[in-house]
């Protein structure tokens, strides 16, 4: 809403709710938990990552019998595999275990938030009718990343009179590994009676933008075609990962000197190369935001639960929070992270995001009443959506994974580690055996784009997301040696993603000289 002109934003304040699936489910459970026969309000429960839920339950003295463990495993597997029919059949059994085993031990698995909300909507038609009246139109952004469980929840929110629009880009579907549904566009078109529409132009990149041309070329490759033109991809190739890290930080320092604006270093995943880059940044005295934490990690979930308890405790007995009270609450949480007894690995990063939230509240939420401000802050920590305020960070340099950078933008983006076996990863061996690619000592190229496996196409989509996070310039890098998961070193080369048909790789210096 902050992007809208003042009067227009004000007119929407009481007519629109911006949240995510988990945030909306949490809001329902906070109000209607008794209807589900829960023994306590969900505010009193600790969120726990699905993967660690059973172990956390056992550590608290809880237990699951074999059949219950099997139900939980099968349900989560169906969610990851996008099997919505299996989820519908299993949701009641899964929820029974949530209520009988997890909730009495103070726990709520992350997916349990959605599954309980599904049951709530299914059992209480009046609530469903009320919601469809209160929210007659539902807009879903980044729809391509919707998983099967959230899709069932979405359908439960809708009535025959509901309006729904889903916005997304199948090419940017990068969460398949945790359940983002394949073929969602086709399925939603049938299930929800939607009319598919496709935009022909990306208006973010107009007037011959280098970044826009690169993005278009990557998209064409994902569709098995070659775009017109030959956009250039700036790439640095180091002898080893240490050389790559040193070159990136040296380039970042040079760009800071000339004032290029905000910069991001976006890695495929945290690992040896990311650690080397951060060590170099620290050595050079360059301040940066470390955003390499996962929004679904147990630590981040625990941080949000901790912050939420601080907010609710501070506002206990009050009708809301004033602007000054909100500042004090945020400051107290930050102080606890940095100097108190509650320590997190990414505590400094969370504190920086709290500062960004404070700035957002000051700049964009002046017109909120105390009760609206309280509900808004509660929703942020309930959803775990603090990262979306990254634009308000005081740090000009950010380090994140590409997955967590979706929806964000920077002036300049670095994409390290586009090295064979690191990116696209283990699929490299399969591609070579199938004759899809051709490898030499210095490069790997795709020779038969029509046979590309889905896994390789998804890795291209991840590269596309990374490239299009840049407004002005993008720099890619690779190395001729990589560190394996076992700590050994292996001869490598730039991956096929740096030599896609229709894209010309050039050195950073050549690109800068022409710019």
Regions found by a protein language model. Give the residues of each.
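Accessory N-terminal region flanking or inserted into the helicase ATPase core
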Residues: 58-139, 148-150, 176
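Conserved two-lobed SF2 helicase motor
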Residues: 17-23, 109-112, 117, 395-402
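Conserved helicase C-terminal RecA-like lobe
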Residues: 311-481, 485
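Helicase P-loop NTPase motor core
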Residues: 193-194, 200-286
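Conserved RecA-like helicase ATPase core segment
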Residues: 151-231
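Conserved P-loop NTPase-based nucleic-acid remodeling module centered on helicase motor cores
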Residues: 2-74, 285
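Conserved helicase/translocase motor-coupling segment
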Residues: 245-369
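Helicase C-terminal subdomain and adjacent C-terminal extension
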Residues: 447, 454, 472, 478-515
